[in-house]
């Protein structure tokens, strides 16, 4: 079945509010119709108000880069999914390898966050991916499959069909190494197969799976040609308006 592509830029810990506003103003009027593709940027928490406000009359959607699994309470430094929804965010990225690695997030944390995000009417972009060691040991499919199953446990079939999964091999994030087209296709298909096993083929046919890891305007077309790759989660190439817009040339 045909799934609408989704290109999401992850700014990570970059841009101040003025830079975020300038970026949105530079890209907003040049984006293709939402009939063709969903386009989003994941802004740091300190930029979300400005980014959402700047994007509100355009087709650009806005993601938070993380949230907590409780709506309110004594959780110093955390971001409420309820408030993200009230602010007008569309998506929340969860389970990024940087969060898992540097901030010790577990599969259980990510699962709780996914449930909290849905409870507040937002859509999770759930990241998964393996280290170079796991990849070279030939255990990538098994490892990533376990991450996906754990992240989605207890969600409804309808919820899973509507979310976004982002496969990002850790060895390809910001390293300049990118997975081959075959790697990306095989792993994104493996992710979809896990969804099929856990929730049925109909759900697996609907869920969108992104590839992430050194995606650039020069290679995005190759990845987007893969039958099981429905989009890209893009880091470095999403920081400049021109390179971000160039990522959408795969539509032509």
From Swiss-Prot:
Gene Ontology molecular functions: triose-phosphate isomerase activity
This protein's record includes keyword Cytoplasm: yes
EC number, UniProt record: 5.3.1.1
UniProt-annotated catalytic positions: 96, 168
One Pfam family here: TIM
BP GO annotations: gluconeogenesis; glyceraldehyde-3-phosphate biosynthetic process; glycerol catabolic process; glycolytic process
Keywords, sorted A to Z: Cytoplasm, Gluconeogenesis, Glycolysis, Isomerase
Top EC class, one word: isomerase
Pathway involvement of the protein, from the record: Carbohydrate biosynthesis; gluconeogenesis; Carbohydrate degradation; glycolysis; D-glyceraldehyde 3-phosphate from glycerone phosphate: step 1/1
Role: Involved in the gluconeogenesis. Catalyzes stereospecifically the conversion of dihydroxyacetone phosphate (DHAP) to D-glyceraldehyde-3-phosphate (G3P).
Similarity field: Belongs to the triosephosphate isomerase family.
Family annotation (PANTHER family): TRIOSEPHOSPHATE ISOMERASE
Subunit comment: Homodimer.
HAMAP family on file: TIM_B
Full protein name: Triosephosphate isomerase
Native organism: Streptococcus pyogenes serotype M2 (strain MGAS10270)
Gene name for this UniProt entry: tpiA
